[in-house]
């Protein structure tokens, strides 16, 4: 399973670890992903999504029904 938020599309980005001696080694910054069950009142069921913390805030702000409609429009499975 890929490390990508289903709502925002955020994925890993790359950068450097930098030591005290300024040595640089490549690393990945991973998004803060969580599996979360959201109750969908209109469908009378839970929907399980893999979302970032920002994705949860988007769902809180816009509503789960609006977000699910967008996910369905782009063919996302959930």
Curated annotation (Swiss-Prot):
The keyword Membrane does not apply. Residues 1-20 are annotated as: Disordered. GO terms for cellular component: cytosolic large ribosomal subunit. SUPFAM superfamilies: L28p-like. GO terms for biological process: translation. Disulfide bonds: none annotated. GO terms for molecular function: structural constituent of ribosome. Keywords: Ribonucleoprotein, Ribosomal protein. PANTHER family: 39S RIBOSOMAL PROTEIN L28, MITOCHONDRIAL, LARGE RIBOSOMAL SUBUNIT PROTEIN BL28M. Belongs to the bacterial ribosomal protein bL28 family. This is Large ribosomal subunit protein bL28. The lineage of its organism: Bacteria, Pseudomonadati, Pseudomonadota, Gammaproteobacteria, Pseudomonadales.
